[in-house]
Structure formats: C-alpha cells, structure tokens
C-alpha cells in the first residue's frame, strides 16, 4: 500500500476517534432530568427544597470570587483576609456577649445585696 493510503487511513481513524468519541460519550450521558427521576422520592423532595439555598450560596460564592479577583492580591490571600475578618468579628461579638453577661450578673448581685 502506498504512503498516501496509509496517511489517509490514519486521518480517517483519527477523525473518527476525535469526533466519534465525544459524540458517543454525549449520547450515553444521562440528562439532569433523567438523573433526577432515578432519585428515590425522599431525595427528590430534599433536592427540590435545598436547590434554591444551594443556588444562592453558589451565587454568593461567585460574587465573593469576583470581589477577590478585583484586588491586587492573590485570591487565596484575599479569601484568607476575609476569613480573618470574620473570625475577628465573631470574637468581638463573643467578647461583647461575655461583657454583657458579666454586667448583668453584677447588677443582679447588687440588687440581691441591696435588698438584704
């Protein structure tokens, strides 16, 4: 067989593999609706209930990623800074709650001692 024939066969085989492979995978892959129908009823119900919440969480995450990407820093450093800010905020809320509880206890002691 001539070299041209060999090259032609290889081009045809490569085209079949490159085009036919993804087309075959696409044809056997189930759609989202087909996968959802395979769920048991409890999973279907839970999926429908949590779908909106998950979509909101994903949208919030994408929004945060966009904000982080606008800064000059790496996304990872920006995310770490935001986590540190949240931790500091939570810690300040805890300390404020502890202080309020301490003040309330002192007031209760004063009331009890004043009434005796």
Curated annotation (Swiss-Prot):
Pfam families per the UniProt record, alphabetical: CBP4
Keyword tags: Chaperone, Coiled coil, Membrane, Mitochondrion, Mitochondrion inner membrane, Transmembrane, Transmembrane helix
Statement: the UniProt record of this protein carries the keyword Repeat: no
Annotated InterPro entries: Cbp4 (IPR012420)
Transmembrane intervals: 7-25
Disordered: region residues: 87-116
Domain of life: Eukaryota
Topology term for the membrane: Single-pass membrane protein
Subcellular location: Mitochondrion inner membrane
Gene Ontology biological process terms, A to Z: mitochondrial respiratory chain complex III assembly
GO CC annotations, alphabetized: mitochondrial inner membrane
Ranges in coiled-coil conformation: 77-116
UniProt-listed PANTHER family: ASSEMBLY FACTOR CBP4
Family in the record: Belongs to the CBP4 family.
Function: Essential for the assembly of ubiquinol-cytochrome c reductase. It has a direct effect on the correct occurrence of the Rieske protein, core 4, core 5 and apocytochrome b.
Protein name: Assembly factor cbp4
Species per Swiss-Prot/TrEMBL record: Neosartorya fischeri (strain ATCC 1020 / DSM 3700 / CBS 544.65 / FGSC A1164 / JCM 1740 / NRRL 181 / WB 181) (Aspergillus fischerianus)
